[in-house]
UniProtKB/Swiss-Prot annotation:
The species this protein was found in: Dictyostelium discoideum
Annotated InterPro entries: Ribosomal_eS21, Ribosomal_eS21_sf
Molecular-function GO terms, alphabetical: structural constituent of ribosome
Family statement: Belongs to the eukaryotic ribosomal protein eS21 family.
Name of the protein in its database record: Small ribosomal subunit protein eS21
Pfam families named in the record: Ribosomal_S21e
Length: 78
């Protein structure tokens, strides 16, 4: 019988702070943004942002999402 090692938990990192998001961090969120073409049709690609609970508890997740979206080109920077 062939045995495989199956990972049940894959750790994630916060997109803004690079902190490790632990399994017990129930305040963390993951935001998936789908890419669309010129006609507005989803093309199967997505960008993933993960935010840790520490960032959300301090009220900095909105500013972090705006900063990351500007870096990726989703928002204009003025």
């Amino acid at each position: 019988m062939d045995s495989k090692n199956v990972e049940l938990y894959t750790p994630r990192k916060c997109s803004a702070t690079n902190r490790l998001i632990t399994a017990k961090d129930h305040a963390s969120v993951q935001i998936n943004i789908g890419h669309v073409n010129a006609e507005g049709i989803y093309n199967g690609e997505q960008t993933i942002f993960a935010f840790c609970g520490f960032l959300r508890n301090n009220g900095q997740s909105d500013a972090a999402l705006n900063r990351l979206a500007q870096q990726k080109g989703f928002l204009k920077s003025f």
